Amino acid sequence: RLALRSPLKFAPQKENFTSSDFTMGQILSQPVTEKHLETETGSRLAYGLLCMQGWRINMEDAHATILDYDDLPGASVLGNKVGFFGVYDGHGGEKAAIFTGKHLHNIVSNTAAFKAQDYVQALKDGFLNCDQAILRDYEMRDDDSGCAATAVIITPKAIFCGNAGDSRTIMSINGYAKALSYDHKPLNEGEKTRICSAGGYVDMGRVNGNLALLRGIGDFEFKRNPD
């Protein structure tokens, strides 16, 4: 995943597969363990990331690393020393995660809230606008994939975190872990009530017996709101 400055060490976790994963042919007989490692240091921030495909037929995850928006071609807001990092955990295919990895950071920076340095609202608007951008994209028109998304905007004074789904952002403070995001899982009573009120249901810890998270980018099969 993604680490800024001081990475934390965690015990490895087993993949949580369901019977439908195997019957639908979504799992390889052996995991792809080749790893992609990337590091970069800027004037203010540094990052390291590691990606591995694992058991899935395709690499369904994506990421974005922006050390400073000023360094992007055509940057619309200059001089604020703002960075952006995102991790996008795909499911049901890779297209939604790849689209989000390519575009979400630009979508966020193009919001009026970002230009006004209201970064909390910029993340909210950016996530919603990314959904709309996927719907408008011709090549995504028949795609049913989705992704959990967690992203941070880093300024010289603060870190702003937004997420949808169950990918978690954790900050290391002198070796201690502090969660910056909140997992949207079906067994959370508040989230479960919201899903049921929208006409869905939760069965075996999954939305409509299928999806293991309650919010995300894409997954339009599960989104009834016409807006």
Where are the predicted features?
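PP2C/PPM-type serine/threonine phosphatase catalytic domain
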Residues: 1-227
